[in-house]
Curated annotation (Swiss-Prot):
Gene name of the encoded protein: proB
Main location: cytoplasm
GO process terms (BP): L-proline biosynthetic process
Cellular compartment(s): Cytoplasm
This protein's record includes keyword ATP-binding: yes
Pathway stated in the Swiss-Prot or TrEMBL entry: Amino-acid biosynthesis; L-proline biosynthesis; L-glutamate 5-semialdehyde from L-glutamate: step 1/2
CDD domains: AAK_G5K_ProB, PUA_G5K
GO CC term, one of those recorded: cytosol
Residues that hold substrate according to the record: 54, 141, 153
Protein name per UniProt: Glutamate 5-kinase
Domain of life of the source: Bacteria
């Protein structure tokens, strides 16, 4: 088995907190220099590299002399603001020694949810790569409240992979890869060397929380691979403790777990719909509507909706659930939540009499709908 990095041209590399800090107590500058050196060698082989690096909050904790990761959002934001300065300065110093420029890019869900800002971010990243600059990306934790509570850089790295249409996402962690069970608890656990991204069995294998310093467990990495696969990108989950891991992967050596993108690649706009917009509510469908969407490729009509949850406005994203509560699709809704409740289970020709107007005959048009 050969590593998917060997034939790849554009790569997103995500480095976890444990690989860039001194056990969470500030940045490990020798480790950052090591990652920079490997990235430089990849670039010399003709590969383009975007780096998603954790470590800002851990560095902020060190500078503020905090021994434990705080739980209060405003304290996390303060740590991120202080630590981001040190993180970017350290990387800049490392890359300058190789006569390369680096660029800081801080993103939030809001940046990627707005179509215009999404396209601007993509253009900026493409320009930086053309200029031989190494983009260093992190979440803008200082302003993104819900990202600090629920987000992680694994997810961000996957969304960046979609954004720039990278060939491979490499997630480096302190574990060797994905195992059939938790190797810390089960001595019979075996490394999964290769599997299909999005495989339900693989998602069941993954579990457990991350460290006190970082936020991402193995499940977030497996779900990140599923997201990356929507733009046709493969994912490698490997140990950053392996010597020269990036260089060896680029040479074709199989290290860690490869999760292959074997699903149909979504068009760029539908990738944006699937992963870059936050869901504001859910609608539950009957079996007929599920079949119409999943098999027939139809639009979602109000008659096929049995329940509405959430408080959403026209044009926002809602998840489409089957009768068992499993999300099968999501899309941009043509009516707000209150209106949707009034027209559910009703034929489209009744909408005007129920609401006093008709915007669209569909609740979600198929052009604004993506199957998951």
């Amino acid at each position: 088995m050969e590593s998917v990095l060997k034939q790849s041209r554009r790569i997103v590399v995500k480095v976890g907190s444990s690989l860039v800090t001194n056990q969470g107590q500030g940045l490990d500058h020798s480790a950052l220099a090591h990652w920079a050196g490997q990235i430089v060698k990849l670039k010399k082989t003709g590969k383009e590299v975007v780096l998603v690096s954790s470590g800002a909050i851990a560095e902020g904790m060190q500078r503020l002399k905090w021994k434990k990761r705080p739980h209060a959002v405003h304290e996390l934001q303060a740590a991120a603001a202080v630590g981001q300065m040190g993180l970017v300065q350290a990387y800049e110093t490392c890359f300058r020694k190789h006569e390369l420029h680096s660029a800081q890019i801080l993103l939030t869900h809001e940046d990627l949810s707005d179509r215009k800002r999404y396209l601007n971010a993509r253009s900026t990243l493409a320009t930086l790569l053309d200029l031989n600059v190494i983009p260093i990306i992190n979440e803008n934790d200082t302003v993104a409240t819900d990202e600090i509570r629920f987000g992680d850089n694994d997810t961000l790295a996957a969304l960046v992979t979609n954004l720039i249409e990278a060939d491979v996402l490499v997630i480096l962690t302190d574990q060797r890869g994905l195992f059939t069970a938790d190797p810390r608890k089960d001595t019979q656990a075996k490394l999964v060397e290769q599997a299909k991204a999005g495989d339900a069995d693989i998602e069941r294998m993954a579990g457990g929380a991350g460290s006190e310093i970082g936020r991402g467990g193995m499940l977030t990495k497996v779900l990140a691979a599923k997201r990356a696969a929507r733009s046709g990108a493969h994912t490698v989950i490997a140990s950053g403790r392996e010597a020269d891991v990036l260089i060896r992967l680029a040479r074709g050596e199989a290290i860690g777990t490869q999760l292959l993108a074997e699903t149909m690649t979504l068009a760029a706009r539908k990738q944006w719909l699937a992963d870059h917009l936050q869901i504001r509510g859910n609608v539950t469908l009957d079996e007929g509507a599920v079949e119409a969407l999943a098999v027939g490729g139809k639009s979602l009509l109000p008659v096929g909706v049995t329940d509405v949850r959430g408080n959403f406005e026209r044009g926002e994203v809602v998840g489409c659930l089957d009768p068992h509560g499993r999300e099968i699709a999501r899309g941009l809704v043509n009516y707000n939540a209150a209106e949707t409740r009034r027209i559910l289970r009703r034929a489209s020709d009744e909408i005007e009499s129920l609401l006093g107007y008709i915007g669209e005959p569909e609740l979600i048009h198929r052009d604004n709908l993506v199957l998951l």
